[in-house]
Every structure is written in structure tokens, then in C-alpha cells.
Regions:
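Helix-to-loop junction immediately C-terminal to a conserved catalytic motif
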Residues: 52
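Conserved ABC ATPase signature
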Residues: 130-134
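Catalytic Walker B motif of ABC-type/P-loop ATPase nucleotide-binding domains
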Residues: 155-158
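Conserved ABC transporter NBD signature motif
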Residues: 60-75
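Conserved ABC ATPase "signature" region
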Residues: 97, 101, 108-126
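ABC transporter nucleotide-binding domain
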Residues: 174-269
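Conserved catalytic motifs of ABC-family nucleotide-binding domains
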Residues: 151
């Protein structure tokens, strides 16, 4: 039996005849970063709210660590919303202490935990700085620290990198990885940044029109779905280009082979895995490859293939 931290079983949510979420069943494993993607209006926010107990489903149920969600202990889940939920007139340290007190964290545990969060999220030098004077990146990192001050087993991150510069984004990404790899937390991540979902997620669920349409690892999604990788190849003898095109076109999972400005463009699912066979066909023609490059299929390609739209449409 799979060791799930959260199980959504046949979740459905209806609003006056509109079905926002339609019979959704998902299992989120303990200690994984679980990406949750979908176009605007797809039902992902409604789904997550039901899965963490903020919204009652019309039907279906949610099991958290073997218990009905209605019976889990306070503080099991930490929420980091996209909107900054900060006290502008408090310092970073005062904010963390206040949130810890709300969760009744004992002082002997609270103090070292506050300091560790300030260190891990590069806020130590701003510990006594009033929140209103922090940069946008610092505020977003503090927003995350407030969500995890009570050491929740499950952390929900809603667009955590929104508006961040690349340096701040890397700090945040490293901390998210550490929550999984060092602390063993289960992280649910929603994001419109495809590279973020790809880099951080162990598995990704893509939903549209309230239904789950695909659930797999980023690597498997890119291998199996989308327009395919592109191999751009230049032969030592361009006169052999058409011969190679005829050799490769009938091959299984080759989507297209065309000549562009004296080079050959080969589009195929999991093209990297097919490179050895491509090279065998080149050798058969008695030519060599002078130049080659590969552009891998992206998660953006996969998303558009499955939903027919961009992430923010």
C-alpha cells in the first residue's frame, strides 16, 4: 500500500450548478514536493483548499496521514499564501515570535527555531528590521518562515516565487528542497513558473476543468507528451541530407524530419534516448556529424499539449 501523506478521494465541489472540481482522486506521498498545475479557473485552488481543510467538499473525503482531515491535530499543515500576510510594523523576529506564540510553541523551542529560520532564509541581518522596510524578496521569504514556524508536517506553497529576482528565487528553491530532503516534510507547490515546477517537483498533477488529466514525474511527462525534443544536425556531406531524412522518417516515435538551411531537424519524443540509433543511420550512409545540438522537450510544451493553453490564460 502506498505511503500517502494526503489522499483525496473522489473530491467534488459544486457551486450553484457549476462543478469546480469533478471527482478528483490524488495521493500525495510523504516527503515529496508535489507540483499542482492548471490554467486559471481549472479548479486547482479549490482542490487544494479542500485537501487542507479550508473548504468543505460537496462530496468525497480527504485523509491526512491515515486520519480524516476533520480529526488531524492543529498545526499539521502550514500555509504560505501568494498574498503577503505580514505585520508591517513588527520586526522579522517579532513577527516570528508572535506566530510561534499563536501556535503555542514553547519558548525553549521557539527561540532557536526563530534563529534557524532567520539563518536559513538569509534574514538574520534583518532580524530587528521593521517589515515595512524590507525588500519584496525578503518579505516573501519571511512569509514562508511564518508558515513553517510551528514545524508542520505538510507545507502548502502558493506561487512562492511570485515577483522574486533570480537570486532570491534560488534561496527559496534551496529552502524548499531542504524541507523535503533534510526535514522530511511534504510540500504542495502551485506555480506558474514552469522551470520552478520542473526543478522542484518529484511529481506533478495537471488539472483542467476540475479533472485530473495527468499525474507523473516531470521527466516522464516530458518524455511521453508534447511536441518532442529537437535534434539539430549538420552532416559532413549535405548531399546526403535527403538520404538520412528517408532513413529516419519511418522510425518509431519520430514526429518529423526536415531540412532547414542545409541542416537536419529531427523532432521526436525522448530524442536523447534515440540518438544512438540516429547515429547508426548516419554511419550507414558513410558520413559524419560535424555539428549537433539538442533542445529538450519542456514542461511548457507538455502543459500546452494537455490543456491547449498557456498557464495564465
Amino acid at each position: 500500500m502506498m505511503d500517502y501523506m494526503i489522499e483525496a478521494q473522489d473530491l467534488t465541489k459544486k457551486y450553484e450548478g457549476l462543478t469546480a472540481v469533478d471527482n478528483l482522486s490524488i495521493g500525495i506521498k510523504k516527503g515529496e514536493v508535489f507540483g499542482f498545475l492548471g490554467p486559471n479557473g481549472a479548479g486547482k485552488t479549490t482542490s487544494i483548499k479542500m485537501m487542507v481543510g479550508l473548504l468543505r467538499p460537496t462530496s468525497g473525503k480527504v485523509i491526512v496521514n491515515g486520519k480524516d482531515i476533520k480529526n488531524i491535530e492543529k498545526g499539521t499543515i502550514g500555509m504560505c499564501p501568494q498574498e503577503l500576510m505580514l505585520w508591517e510594523n513588527l520586526t522579522c523576529k517579532e513577527s516570528l515570535n508572535l506566530m510561534a506564540d499563536m501556535y503555542e510553541v514553547p519558548k525553549n523551542i521557539r527561540d532557536p527555531r526563530v534563529q534557524k529560520l532567520l539563518d536559513d532564509l538569509f534574514l538574520s541581518e534583518k532580524a530587528d528590521t521593521v517589515v515595512s522596510k524590507l525588500s519584496g524578496g525578503m518579505k516573501r521569504r519571511l512569509n514562508l518562515a511564518l508558515a513553517v514556524i510551528h514545524e508542520p508536517e505538510i507545507v502548502v506553497l502558493d506561487e512562492p516565487s511570485e515577483g522574486l529576482d533570480p537570486q532570491s528565487r534560488r534561496v527559496l528553491w534551496n529552502y524548499i528542497r531542504a524541507m523535503r530532503d533534510v526535514e522530511g516534510k511534504t510540500v504542495i507547490l502551485t506555480t506558474h513558473i514552469m522551470d520552478e515546477a520542473d526543478q522542484l517537483s518529484d511529481r506533478i498533477a495537471i488539472i483542467d476543468h476540475g479533472k485530473l488529466i495527468r499525474l507523473d514525474t516531470p521527466a516522464n511527462l516530458k518524455k511521453e507528451i508534447g511536441e518532442g525534443d529537437v535534434v539539430d544536425m549538420k552532416l559532413s556531406d549535405p548531399l546526403k541530407n535527403q538520404d538520412l531524412i528517408q532513413e529516419l522518417t519511418p522510425q518509431e516515435d519520430i514526429i518529423s524530419v526536415v531540412e532547414v538551411k542545409g541542416r537536419i531537424n529531427i523532432r521526436a519524443l525522448n530524442a536523447i534516448g534515440k540518438l544512438p540509433k540516429m547515429m547508426q543511420r548516419v554511419e550507414k550512409l558513410g558520413v559524419v556529424v560535424e555539428d549537433i545540438s539538442v533542445r529538450q522537450n519542456t514542461l511548457e510544451d507538455v502543459f500546452i499539449e494537455l490543456t491547449g493553453t498557456g498557464l495564465r490564460e
